[in-house]
Amino acid sequence: MTSSEPASPEIEQQANSAPRRPRILLAASGSVAAIKFGNLCHSFSEWAEVKAVATRASLHFIDRASLPKDVILYTEEDEWSTWNKVGDSVLHIELRSWADILVIAPLSANTLGKIAGGLCDNLLTCIVRAWDYSKPFFVAPAMNTLMWKNPFTEQHIMSIDELGVSLIPPVTKRLACGDYGNGAMAEPSVIYSTVRLFFESRVQQSGNIVQQPV
């Protein structure tokens, strides 16, 4: 077949059904562990298409220069600046539909409480409120030991577990405040390997390359 000849229907069908990289939506909320968000984005971008979301509080800790150049970071301002009139796309719905997997790392005590209570007062919590829970959703909490041990935290973790959210537990180490105890976010390498192993196992079981967004 020469370059001027049209592709056969069989070839076009194969091209349309070719595997694509998983689409990962990474999000950071307001914990000092957000200083590792750039490393997390780099880990995932080697394997998947990545888009990122940051709450206003998390921006105190995120070094934008540390993010991969091909990763777009969406903030609260983008939620409003991209919509002008009825019929325009809504950012939190667009991101929810685009992603195969949602990962919040770090998940602060405040954002955990909002999600558990169904609140949606910023870009990230609106994405969560609109999320399709048949798609994987991981959280990696990060907070002071006293906050992690608080009875409210236990209730909130139970609430999101009932939704099908997967917990990547915090670890015990020296915390940012100087205390030693449980509550530190798992390392980016652990978060990445946990999500990738889960996703690839799910793909093998289903026989699909990726779960297509709804």
Swiss-Prot record:
Stimuli inducing this protein: Accumulates upon salt stress (NaCl).
SUPFAM superfamilies per record: Homo-oligomeric flavin-containing Cys decarboxylases, HFCD
One Pfam family named in its UniProt record: Flavoprotein
The protein's enzyme class: lyase
Active-site residues, Swiss-Prot/TrEMBL: 92, 177
Binding site for FMN: 30-32, 55-57, 108-111, 142
Cofactor: how bound: Binds 1 FMN per subunit.
Catalyzed reaction equations: N-[(R)-4-phosphopantothenoyl]-L-cysteine + H(+) = (R)-4'-phosphopantetheine + CO2
Known pathway: Cofactor biosynthesis; coenzyme A biosynthesis; CoA from (R)-pantothenate: step 3/5
Tissue: Mainly expressed in stems, to a lower extent in flowers, leaves and fruits, and at basal levels in roots.
Entry's localization field: Cell membrane; Cytoplasm
GO molecular function: FMN binding; phosphopantothenoylcysteine decarboxylase activity
Phenotypic consequence of gene deletion: Reduced coenzyme A (CoA) content. No roots. Decreased salt tolerance.
Names of the cofactor(s): FMN
Annotated N-[(R)-4-phosphopantothenoyl]-L-cysteine binding sites: 144, 174, 176, 185
Role summary: Involved in plant growth, and promotes salt and osmotic tolerance, probably via coenzyme A (CoA) accumulation and endogenous proline accumulation. Catalyzes the decarboxylation of 4'-phosphopantothenoylcysteine to 4'-phosphopantetheine, a key step in coenzyme A biosynthesis. Required for roots development.
Quaternary assembly: Homotrimer.
Protein name: Phosphopantothenoylcysteine decarboxylase HAL3
Organism: Malus domestica (Apple)
